[in-house]
Amino acid sequence: MKNGEILEVTVKEIKDNTVIGLVDEQNVYVRAKDISLLEPEKKYFGFLYLNRHGEWCVDTTIPKASLKSFGWGKVETVDHSSGVFVSIGLADKDILVSLDDLPDNSRDWPQVDDELIVRLERDNKDRLWGKLATDEDLISGGFISFDHKFKQNEMVSGHVYHLGKTGVFILLKEGRFAYLHHTEMEENVHLGQEITGRIIGFGAHDRINISLLKNAYARIDDDAAMILAAIKFTPDKKLLLSDSSTPKEIKDKFGISKSSFKRAVGHLLKQNLITSENGYLKIKS
């Protein structure tokens, strides 16, 4: 018998909540979502594993994460000396994703309750390890779908499955790849984290670009919003005011100081919402 095998078990005895089975004439514990459905002397297919107590068990609910396929695993424990332990659905066994397969900086590690997409790997000591999915694994594993039609500024959610040099890669709940550049996040994002962001573009290879920042209009302050509204409601979408305007002209128009005006205009320029040309402020087309 080997850890992680999918094999046939014969139920030998059912007593209270304990089910004993036989695999190659060796006793094993049999797990099932509903043991009342199990019958003595009947054969069932299941997933063979050593539980945390070193006992052989066969679970008749075969986990999606196996030696041949990828599945979701929920982080149960973080151990900075070894890695993170994820649950793949086994009642008394979590799978270790080694620190060798995790980011160098532990602040980028998954946290408890985060989710990873893993496949199992068995080493020469018959131990099971969790291996993280790549783009190719997600494609071949059937995680990708093109059913949903995304729109600009649509809010989407997903989990981070890979950290890159300039940003993070996400698998959206709708089954599409997404990318989050580091300039589009306000704080660190880690592996396995569930995030919700706004679509800001559509990149190469059918990958969606998202942002965790509020859109430009939501990020401007009250003074900037007042100036922007004033420009928008002029007939030709331009306002005869600029840095060269006098404090009195600015005060008469907006009731704010020139320094506040310059700060607000600078914010609007930085957000690419307006332009400043020939003494006029204009809505950027």
Could you tell me what each predicted segment is?
Residues M1-S285:
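Single-stranded RNA-binding regions, centering on S1/OB-family and related RNA-binding modules
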